Swiss-Prot record:
InterPro entries: NA-bd_OB-fold (IPR012340), RNA-binding_domain_S1_IF1 (IPR006196), TIF_IF1 (IPR004368). One of the essential components for the initiation of protein synthesis. Stabilizes the binding of IF-2 and IF-3 on the 30S subunit to which N-formylmethionyl-tRNA(fMet) subsequently binds. Helps modulate mRNA selection, yielding the 30S pre-initiation complex (PIC). Upon addition of the 50S ribosomal subunit IF-1, IF-2 and IF-3 are released leaving the mature 70S translation initiation complex. GO terms for molecular function: ribosome binding; rRNA binding; translation initiation factor activity. Its main location: cytoplasm. NCBIfam families: infA. Keywords: Cytoplasm, Initiation factor, Protein biosynthesis, RNA-binding, rRNA-binding. GO terms for cellular component: cytosol. It is found in: Cytoplasm. The gene is infA2. Component of the 30S ribosomal translation pre-initiation complex which assembles on the 30S ribosome in the order IF-2 and IF-3, IF-1 and N-formylmethionyl-tRNA(fMet); mRNA recruitment can occur at any time during PIC assembly. It comes from the Bacteria. The keyword RNA-binding applies. This is Translation initiation factor IF-1 2.
Length: 85
């Protein structure tokens, strides 16, 4: 049996909960509880209330999600630019 595809969504962190969990409101208005992915935890990426994030949702349980990316305001897509000397 093949694995089901994950649903990718964008949302806004409303509240920081204990045990590295977050209350997130998706762009479509749906609210859920999300946790940080292992790579974000490993690299000590901090998530605060008000951050824009990308999430993965399972099609079986839409009340829980995994945060996979934190969008930084003012930085567009693409590789980081090195300052010129």
């Amino acid at each position: 049996m093949a694995k089901e595809e994950l649903i990718e969504m964008h949302g806004l962190v409303d509240e920081v909960l204990p045990d590295s969990r977050f209350r997130v409101t998706l762009d479509n208005g749906h609210k859920l509880v999300a946790y940080t992915s292992g790579k974000m935890r490993k690299n000590h990426i901090r998530i605060l209330a008000g951050d824009q994030v990308s999430l993965e949702l399972s099609p079986y349980d839409l009340s829980k999600g995994r945060i996979t990316f934190r969008h930084i305001a003012g930085r567009g897509p693409g590789p980081a630019q090195r300052p010129s000397r």
